[in-house]
Amino acid sequence: MTDAFAAGDELPGGIRAFATARPGEVVYWLPRQRTLVAGDVLLGAGAKPGGTQEPLRLCPERWLGKATHDDLRESLRPLLDLPVSRVLVSHGRPILRAGKRALEEVLS
């Protein structure tokens, strides 16, 4: 059995879930660690497809269903209010320092 939660709910340990424009995808905020767990909506350097060396980039638009990159940026903007140090991604290298700066760049 799994417990259901909604984006915005506070989970054990103060963890928060943030909705994204990608259907079924959330970003988790771990406040004690000042870490975002971004799943598939953000990609780190070297991630396929593309394999660019940008520290952080948006997932390919085709992964978003009917949403666009603009929709994704808008859904992620509330994360800019957080004191992010690290961004963990499912694809590519994580951001282990200056996470907020990397997030600001990708959402600009």
Positions of PLM-derived features:
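Active-site HxH/HxHxD metal-binding segment of metal-dependent hydrolases
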Residues: 1-11
